[in-house]
Amino acid sequence: MNTVYVVGTCDTKGGELRYLRDLIRQAGCDAVLVDVSVSEFHSQAADVDVQPSEVARFHPNPPKPEDLKDRGKAVAAMAQALVEFIRSRPDVDGIIGAGGTGGTALIAPALRALPIGTPKVLVSTVASGNVAPYVGPTDISMMYSVTDVSGLNRISRVVLANAAHSVAGMVLNKVSAAKDERPAIGLTMFGVTTPCVQAVTRALEADFDCLVFHATGTGGQSFEKLADSALLVGGIDVSTTEVCDYLVGGVFPCTADRFGAFARTRLPYVGSCGALDMVNFGAMDTVPSRFRSRRLHVHNPQVTLMRTTPEECNRIGEWIAERLNLCEGTVRFLIPELGVSAIDAPGQPFHDPEADSALFAALERTLRRTTKRQLIRVPLHINDPQFAELLVTNFKEALREH
């Protein structure tokens, strides 16, 4: 029978977690209730399948008892133990958790540790806000609890029932990944680089399973997570725009580890300057006051773009080149001299040859070129069909060299 793990703190959410467990069993799955309570006064319940003490034993470096009197430290320790506990279980067909801010922070890392494709649902009081820190580069389904996860009432019963039935439905109707003999490659795309990425995909999809990632911070992390997991044979990183948000302060930042997967794996890497002309913010009224006098462009009602300056482009180019210098595999980084996005062209709002020149010069100055690590400048726009052809040609050559 398919097994769903139900995870939460039974000292404060016991009724809700048992309700989830019972509904999942009624739907036709086995359910394992895992208690991750951290209260020192919590007594073990007989109907819990896995007690907190059992989970805690999986912590790789058990904290001192006195440290666990601090709730924050106790939650962090239990979260780490839960990750290792879940990884050790061979029968996790699906998992569901429920909690407030503390419970969400405790449970989410374990869900992130599971493979992509394993059903994961998290009912949370914080699911209507920024969930990126909880979801990360994974496929967690977060559901807003509407009311607090504090007792069963006419609202929580419906929300929790929907969550229970959703995870059970996913487990009972799991779609196996289609068998595909083509090797997989990752590509990064942004709205303003779409023509380029679509052209590259069309040229390669007969021979490769092309996985396109939206460069929104977590998109780049997902791209590199698959590279680290040996699920890709290479990457065509057209849209490195997340670096702008990381260095300047936008809402779609990469992490300090951007490009790290290709340094670690030495997989063939072909990259470019896609959308390095912009930093992303939300709606216009969310743009920080220090940037209000800058060149701004409303991409849509929820996304405002800010043009990167020559000084920022210099930093961006240096940072990317320094990261690529760590890559010992085949690296080809292509510079489209006539513009790096759809709105970086003559007559478009972000056309700024001075800023682009600063970016390109920083890349040239900083990248340590070798026979395997190359920088290629071409008099083309990033969305020109010929540029896509060059990306394809260089990727095929990089694969042959690998």
Swiss-Prot record:
CDD domains: Tm-1-like (cd15488)
Keywords: Plasmid
Record-annotated disulphide pairs: none
Pfam families the record matches: UPF0261, UPF0261_C
InterPro entries assigned to the protein according to its UniProt record, in alphabetical order: Tobamovirus_resist_UPF0261, UPF0261, UPF0261_C, UPF0261_N
Highest rank taxon of the organism: Bacteria
Record HAMAP family: UPF0261
Family label: Belongs to the UPF0261 family.
Protein name: UPF0261 protein y4oU
UniProt source species: Sinorhizobium fredii (strain NBRC 101917 / NGR234)
